[in-house]
């Protein structure tokens, strides 16, 4: 290796260059003359004669890079340390230095090393064609940043895709107890989007304006239920706040904030998806989850009878009737000859 490096350092220049600040031409060896050029590489680059082509300028810059590389290798071997970063800007094969002659090979799709990120290495080509940049490390850092940015974009999109596919399964079957019949059965849960679509499609068209649920109201309802309110077999349990849930002495029910006031949720659901309700009509639950079930099939409508209310309010009338029943009738079957005995 040492002999090869020595030959490389003493390789004569094939062409001569006229540079400002230097007398004569570069007709010596890299070991003796190029050191003077490396001290002020930008000046040397800017003072190249216009008679030379871009290819000659690239070869000139390549010779300077080769000399730098050989000097770094020599210093590293003397110190007994190896730093891979010194060679990161060059070819992976340290013996094949001539591969850098054709810079345009970086964009060759046949080159597997650069085929996937050829656009990111565009700055490497611009480096050889530019008169203002001479540091390969700066160009490599830009290319690395571009690659990292692309990887970050792909990682972000992949993460978003994973989050979006979390709801790809519309139905999830799980086993829960059915309180209406005391048996354990399976029921299918739905995501909020399916429940929301179902509510929109099945809302009655002639709902009174004061009871009609709008889109935002339906969205809020979907947040706190995970099954259909139209299920014929299972209860639809409300998972939000329940009034008097910890007070067994009072009835439990769900208050829904509707048009700046609290309204019983089961009345809203019945009015929007079954039939309108007036102020004299009431609902009762026919399942075990009274007050917390949102299944419209578990509601029964009824209203108080006026006669029953009157009877309950006037219990004295019943006492008079009982006194009349104590009358004893004695006599024949002929109604004209009936005798009433008041004891």
From Swiss-Prot:
Give the compositionally biased regions (Basic residues).
Answer: 62-71
Q: Which regions are flagged for Basic and acidic residues bias?
A: 72-81
- For bias kind Acidic residues, which ranges apply? 83-107
User: What's the domain of life for this entry?
Assistant: Viruses
Region (Disordered) residue spans: 1-25, 62-119, 169-188
What is the name attached to this protein's record? Uncharacterized protein R328
Species name for this entry? Answer: Acanthamoeba polyphaga mimivirus
């Amino acid at each position: 290796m040492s002999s090869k490096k020595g030959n490389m350092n003493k390789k004569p220049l094939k062409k001569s260059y006229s540079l400002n600040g230097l007398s004569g031409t570069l007709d010596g060896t890299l070991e003796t003359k190029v050191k003077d050029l490396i001290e002020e590489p930008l000046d040397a680059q800017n003072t190249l004669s216009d008679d030379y082509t871009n290819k000659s300028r690239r070869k000139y810059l390549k010779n300077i890079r080769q000399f730098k590389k050989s000097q770094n290798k020599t210093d590293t071997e003397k110190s007994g340390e190896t730093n891979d970063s010194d060679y990161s800007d060059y070819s992976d094969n340290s013996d094949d230095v001539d591969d850098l002659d054709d810079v345009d090979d970086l964009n060759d799709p046949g080159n597997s090393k650069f085929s996937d990120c050829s656009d990111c290495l565009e700055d490497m080509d611009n480096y050889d064609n530019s008169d203002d940049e001479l540091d390969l490390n700066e160009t490599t850092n830009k290319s690395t940043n571009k690659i990292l940015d692309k990887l970050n974009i792909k990682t972000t999109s992949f993460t978003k895709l994973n989050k979006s596919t979390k709801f790809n399964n519309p139905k999830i079957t799980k086993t829960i107890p059915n309180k209406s019949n005391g048996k354990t059965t399976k029921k299918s849960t739905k995501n909020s989007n399916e429940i929301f679509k179902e509510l929109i499609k099945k809302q009655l068209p002639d709902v009174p304006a004061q009871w009609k649920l709008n889109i935002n109201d339906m969205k809020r309802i979907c947040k706190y239920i995970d099954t259909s309110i139209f299920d014929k077999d299972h209860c639809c349990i409300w998972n939000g706040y329940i009034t008097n849930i910890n007070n067994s002495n009072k009835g439990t029910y769900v208050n829904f904030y509707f048009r700046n006031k609290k309204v019983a949720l089961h009345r809203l659901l019945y009015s929007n998806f079954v039939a309108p309700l007036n102020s004299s009509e009431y609902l009762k639950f026919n399942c075990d989850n009274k007050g917390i079930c949102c299944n419209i099939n578990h509601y029964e409508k009824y209203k108080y009878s006026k006669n029953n209310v009157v009877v309950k309010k006037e219990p004295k009338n019943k006492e008079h009737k009982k006194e009349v029943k104590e009358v004893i009738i004695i006599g024949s079957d002929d109604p004209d000859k009936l005798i009433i005995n008041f004891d």
